[in-house]
A protein has these predicted regions:
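Long, well-ordered mid-to-C-terminal structural blocks that present hydrophobic/aromatic surfaces
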Residues: 1-75
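Short loop/turn motifs that connect adjacent beta-strands in outer-membrane beta-barrel proteins
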Residues: 31-42, 97-110, 142-147
């Protein structure tokens, strides 16, 4: 109730307990050689979460409301926790050994594309779904022998408009690893 006042030494309960169920189904398929690669793989994961009681936790979705000091905010209905939420993850990767038809003997090349889409609902547990949020990643890895690895990766966050606090957090990664 908005009208309630909190007095000195009063405890404010910011957390509670409720039943929470998550389901996840994953599948991996190796297509074998094709499209010039030695192996082509697809990973699909479907996720679902269900919370039995969302009362009193209307805006508990992580990052659902911006914090503005001294200003109360009621927020909009699309920022509220929902009883159920679901989304999917896709990852497609390919391996190519002895890249460039043997010109680079001992070099393996692995491009990968990953997609994440929170389709419907908001949840803070079991996958942290935020309706409409999407992430796409493109990654390229080159390995020389068993010891040297180069990785280049870029990620784009999009979707969910002003509710997505990761919207401006696109990232680039460059990594060199040497194992001995």
């Amino acid at each position: 109730n908005v009208e309630e006042r909190v007095g000195p030494s009063q405890v404010i309960r910011a957390a509670g307990q409720t039943d929470f169920t998550t389901l996840s189904l994953a599948g991996l398929h190796s297509f074998g050689p094709g499209f010039g690669f030695n192996d082509l793989k697809l990973l699909v994961e479907l996720g679902y979460s269900y919370m039995s009681d969302t009362s009193g936790q209307a805006y508990s979705a992580q990052g659902s409301l911006p914090f503005i000091a001294g200003q109360a905010s009621e927020g909009s209905s699309d920022q509220r926790l929902t009883r159920s939420a679901y989304g999917y993850r896709l990852a497609l990767s390919a391996d190519r050994h002895n890249f460039f038809n043997g010109m680079l003997s001992g070099v393996s090349f692995t491009p990968a594309l990953r997609l994440r889409h929170d389709v419907q609902g908001n949840s803070v547990l079991g996958g942290e779904f935020l309706e409409g949020r999407k992430l796409a990643e493109l990654e390229i890895t080159a390995r020389y022998g068993l010891s040297l690895e180069f990785l280049v990766k870029y990620g784009w966050f999009f979707g969910a408009a002003d509710r997505n606090q990761l919207l401006d957090r696109d990232f680039a990664l460059f990594d060199i690893s040497y194992s001995f």
